[in-house]
């Protein structure tokens, strides 16, 4: 049986979910064998048997190699061809939503990277028929795009066909990028900001992951739900937010076996209709928090050491600049270098 059909069987029968995500080819190779007619047909038959609407309940994940923000035209074209191949595979399978990472600016400015990305998305819309391109938010690491809602606002302004463009919000990435969603008040503030800058109606999927790293760490470190720095409350809020009804909510948490995902699906369903002061939910939240305490302490320690190192480097650099300025003053006289202080 093909891997795609296995994903459906695992999802439907074992972990009792009603949506899923998978790759339509190897996510770490530029080229893969064509999608055979036999595989495509088996997928369609499996979806029909399981009463899955692949156009709405599946959120395919794109290749990790794709970087269409790249300033290098040759590399960008290679990424684009891989991207379009993914989209066409989705259309053959009847899949309606394709999620991908926006990429890194590499040797160009953020504005140039967003322009490159938008141009490729617009071209991809022209070369495909129906699949909706879903851009995922990122943790703000390095030169990656998608770490701020402003990035998405800028990208959206350059997309010609907004009917076929959407956003996937990842809870871990959102938190790591500095958006605090741990309380009802802060969650509302973050979603309101996204709604104002991009539009909540453009969210067509969530990746549900706790975070091993603390707020604003810019680290993409997924943790099992309830064990990390997010805790259960953000997931309760998402599960009870009617704006997300009918869109895929996909787990990307660490799991040695599907049993872990099955438990998390059950936990997420348990949260529906529950208030923050529900006794059973509070007990489960405390239990999971205790289980993850050692890991959180370890990652917080790593984060604090990294931040302290950055502060020392900054102070050293500032000190070097001050020393250089004083030397210039000694050579030229204070009056002649007055502008250096301004």
Curated annotation (Swiss-Prot):
EC code: 3.1.21.-
GO biological process, one term: base-excision repair
Compartments in which it is found: Nucleus
UniProt-annotated binding residues for Zn(2+) 2: 136, 170, 207, 252
Molecular function terms, GO-annotated: DNA binding; DNA-(apurinic or apyrimidinic site) endonuclease activity; phosphoric diester hydrolase activity; zinc ion binding
Keywords, sorted A to Z: DNA damage, DNA repair, Hydrolase, Metal-binding, Nucleus, Zinc
Compositional bias of kind Basic and acidic residues: 299-310
Primary localisation category: nucleus
Region (Disordered) location: 299-342
Domain of life: Eukaryota
Cofactor: Zn(2+)
Entry binding sites for Zn(2+) 1: 61, 136
HAMAP family listed in its UniProt record: Nfo
Protein purpose: DNA repair enzyme that cleaves apurinic/apyrimidinic (AP) sites and removes 3'-blocking groups present at single strand breaks of damaged DNA. Provides back-up AP endonuclease (APE) activity to apn2 together with uve1.
Family under the similarity heading: Belongs to the AP endonuclease 2 family.
This protein's name: Apurinic-apyrimidinic endonuclease 1
Native source organism of the sequence: Schizosaccharomyces pombe (strain 972 / ATCC 24843) (Fission yeast)
Gene expressing this chain: apn1
